[in-house]
Swiss-Prot record:
Name of the molecule in the record: Aliphatic sulfonates import ATP-binding protein SsuB
Subunit text: The complex is composed of two ATP-binding proteins (SsuB), two transmembrane proteins (SsuC) and a solute-binding protein (SsuA).
EC number: 7.6.2.14
InterPro entries assigned: AAA+_ATPase (IPR003593), ABC_transporter-like_ATP-bd (IPR003439), ABC_transporter-like_CS (IPR017871), ABC_transporter_ATP-bind (IPR050166), P-loop_NTPase (IPR027417)
Gene from which this protein is expressed: ssuB
Amino acid sequence: MQMYPVEQAALVELEAGLARREAAQPAAEAPRKAGGVALHVRQVVKRYDGREVLHNVALDVAPGEFLAIVGRSGCGKSTLLRLVAGLEAADGGSITVDGESAAKGRARHADVRVMFQDARLLPWKRVLDNVALGLPRTRRGEAADVLAQVGLADRAREWPARLSGGQRQRVALARALVHHPQLLLLDEPLGALDALTRIEMQGLIESLWRRLGFTALLVTHDVSEAVALADRIVLIEDGRIAMDERVALARPRERGAAGFAQLEAAVLKRVMRQAPQAQVPSHAGAHADPAATTAPLNVSWAA
């Protein structure tokens, strides 16, 4: 994967920031207790260049719940995830994570982790060192334990460039989970993987979520993925919540089952019901949902 200078500079800054944080941590720091947190979104508004991308969005997610957000490209779903993560500030309304504001710069970094479509591994660090970023030295052994949980114990000393796309995403997942997040934000994390690898990763994410109990918020274009993983599926259309559907299917879910296929078809039909928006001229810029294509460079992604 080609890395542009600005991306490489961001990775260097990330590594330096994590090193500073590690040095400031008490040597005997213990991992946080596992479990999920409540998320409350209240009448949130977000504008780009005067255009509203999110319109009075209101949403509640219970502790330990798995919520999937679907919708067409540019509908605002990635923007909402960035606001929840504290990567950007809303122009109106409020977002709280476990009762604390998620406003830009105030999100509780220790309890929230984000996993993107690009694993964003540091290419000059081996796999185990990527997972251990930000951990105090007394907890480095946990990185190896989590690598084993995602099935990569034998790749600990490999360089990221030698891994497949699915393996890199497993490392990114391990890097997030080693910090015991109480809220895991997933922004199309499996979008670049082949179909079989996607299904394997979905099973891995579900099994770890069920065991660890964190709250999960998944943004995806894949309705089948949403049905497979989520307790609820929310559809965003033109910056508004157009559907909030509970998934009343027993786990683990079978894609060939009649109930699974029926719900997938119903949600997909609802997503497709909206007519596509007129294409934005190239000279006008893409302001519909910049978060869908712009990689954040000032955050600790899944680290």
